[in-house]
């Protein structure tokens, strides 16, 4: 009888590949992502954006100057060619999410590393940049109680982990006035874990089953960009930009483990009675999405900048895990800007940068015949700190809030209402820049 019930448990487990968002309750766990949608693809994508850019909706392709100064824009490496000072930029990230499904809700919160980047000018040769950025996060936990005749069981799924990207980039001005190009060479690395469990909490005679899948992702990637800068007179300027990626492939070392524990309680807390480990697959390749972004910004000196981006990413070549629907195309738009009331004013609040933006994305995920959309408004401040070294050092504290929603309660899906807080710090200085004496 136990063998028959064990086969029942495994058949329930193996039938749950795509049940994820059909579960009646969703809960988050301690990761940097609290999204049930992060189980698809490589997780919830973080993008190569600073808090300054996020507060302006995520504009990136055409962003070259901000507040009259060159900005470190990893999303378009052509911008490195504009740097005239060494730039350090780092941040932390916080997330507050309300998950809703049907009439039930759950609240989560977490804080994590944002990014750390450096930019160094190389005089007429252009500029280079290097750093470490988060690439994606996985973090979800959901369960459903069901009956099989008189037998009651709980089916649950959970995942955690994330990918990071270390990069080195170079941008250079071309002989054609105003035109620049650049590229980033990156190394992607990290671990993603997904777990499916079937538990029989009220029956100690039936074994609980756990299936754990680990993905170890490693590999090199390349992205590139181009910008055209033009002065419009009266201290106004315009930058048109494009950035994209190649058909990057990275390696996926995949391993699976099946575990049997005693019933009558939590499978994760019980002692394992038996374990089956599958051989590690070393030769799997993951196709990263092909991306194309175009954007434009218009600026007036230190006073203001406005911009817009169109973003496209094709995930249809991404190999999904067994039981999951194929991914599609991610299409998005971003609008935003920055305003400084009076750069020469002695009043402090007149020299603060005020930022506002909005974005809308049709994501690559379609579930229950409905596209999952993501939309948000954002706002932030660039708070200047005291200048030192006779005006050669400019430091700024960047605070950004994103207020958005992903998904919907319709079509039996999960709705996420979230607040993302980004706290960043920027230093512009003359490190590594050789001075001259007249």
Per-region residue spans from a language model:
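Cleavable N-terminal export/targeting peptides
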Residues: 1-40, 432-438
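Subset of outer-membrane beta-barrel
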Residues: 29-438
């Amino acid at each position: 009888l136990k063998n028959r019930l064990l086969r029942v448990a495994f058949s329930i487990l193996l039938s749950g590949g795509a049940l994820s968002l059909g579960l009646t309750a969703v809960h988050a766990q301690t990761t940097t992502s609290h999204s049930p949608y992060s189980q698809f693809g490589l997780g919830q994508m973080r993008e190569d954006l600073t808090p300054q850019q996020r507060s302006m909706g995520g504009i990136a392709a055409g962003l070259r100057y901000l507040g009259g100064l060159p900005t470190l824009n990893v999303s378009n490496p052509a911008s490195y060619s504009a740097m005239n000072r060494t730039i350090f930029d780092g941040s932390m990230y916080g997330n507050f999410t309300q998950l809703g499904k049907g009439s039930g809700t759950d609240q989560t919160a977490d804080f994590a590393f944002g990014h750390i980047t450096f930019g160094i000018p190389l005089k007429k040769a252009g500029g280079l940049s290097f750093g470490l950025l988060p690439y994606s996060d996985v973090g979800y936990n959901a369960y459903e109680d069901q009956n099989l005749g008189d037998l009651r069981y709980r089916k649950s799924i959970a995942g955690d982990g994330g990918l990071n990207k270390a990069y080195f980039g170079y941008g250079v001005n071309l002989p054609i006035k105003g035109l620049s190009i650049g590229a980033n060479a990156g190394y992607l690395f990290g671990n993603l874990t997904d777990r499916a469990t079937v538990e029989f909490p009220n029956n100690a005679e039936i074994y609980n089953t756990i299936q754990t899948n680990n993905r170890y992702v490693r590999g090199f990637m390349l992205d590139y960009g181009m910008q055209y800068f033009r002065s419009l007179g009266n201290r106004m300027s315009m930058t048109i930009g494009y950035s994209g990626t190649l058909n990057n492939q990275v390696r996926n070392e995949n391993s699976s483990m099946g575990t049997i524990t005693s019933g009558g309680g939590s499978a994760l807390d019980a002692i394992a009675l038996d374990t089956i480990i599958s051989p590690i697959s070393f030769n799997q390749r993951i196709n990263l999405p092909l991306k194309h972004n175009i954007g434009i910004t218009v600026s007036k000196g230190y006073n203001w900048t406005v911009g817009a981006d169109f973003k496209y990413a094709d995930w249809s070549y991404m190999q999904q895990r067994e039981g999951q629907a194929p991914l599609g195309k991610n299409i998005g738009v971003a609008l935003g800007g920055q305003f400084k009331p009076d750069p020469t004013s002695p009043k402090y609040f007149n020299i603060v940068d005020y930022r506002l933006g909005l974005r809308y994305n049709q994501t690559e995920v379609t579930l229950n015949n409905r596209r999952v959309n993501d939309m948000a408004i954002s706002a932030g401040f660039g708070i200047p700190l005291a200048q030192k070294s006779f005006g050669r050092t400019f430091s700024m504290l960047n605070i950004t809030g994103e207020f958005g929603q992903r998904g919907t309660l319709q079509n039996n899906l999960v709705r996420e209402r979230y607040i993302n807080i980004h706290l960043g710090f920027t230093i512009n200085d003359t490190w590594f820049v050789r001075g001259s004496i007249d």
